[in-house]
């Protein structure tokens, strides 16, 4: 087995991009501190929803490294749900090793709702309270990318 060139360590999520059809943006006088506003207690139409599995800072870096031709691996923690399977499948499709992924029975994989309006996005986040465990590589990788965990 060849050593890993690039190891990414960080949380993985499934993003559900919700393309909003109707909303408004209100900013202060300096055009900063903007807020997205929608009717309260109403049914709000949206254009579409698209789920993307296996994303986040670490996964995005691992995919980039793999596409550059490096032997890439992801070290992360996931739940025991279907979203974990989707993330692992996405990694394998991109040629990323999944040998360093820890599954937690009874937990869900991190899932974010991304409210996408015009050219901006607002992300609703919920991170699972994993008791993080990591499977170290049997050889030191050439490069390690460490990013957010549980944040």
Model-assigned labels for residue ranges:
Residues 25-26, 90-93, 117-120:
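Short, hinge-like loop/turn segments at secondary-structure boundaries
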Residues 90-107:
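A glycine-rich helix N-cap at a beta->alpha junction
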Residues 77-79:
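Alpha-helical transmembrane segments within multi-pass membrane transporters and channels
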Residues 21-24, 88-90, 128-129:
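Short, glycine/charged-enriched secondary-structure capping and boundary segments
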Residues 99-104, 112-151:
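Conserved phosphate-binding/catalytic loop of the ribokinase/pfkB sugar-kinase fold
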Residues 2-4, 9, 69-71, 96, ...:
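Short coil/turn connectors at secondary-structure junctions
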Residues 1-75:
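Glycine-rich phosphate/adenosyl-contacting loop at the front of the ribokinase-like
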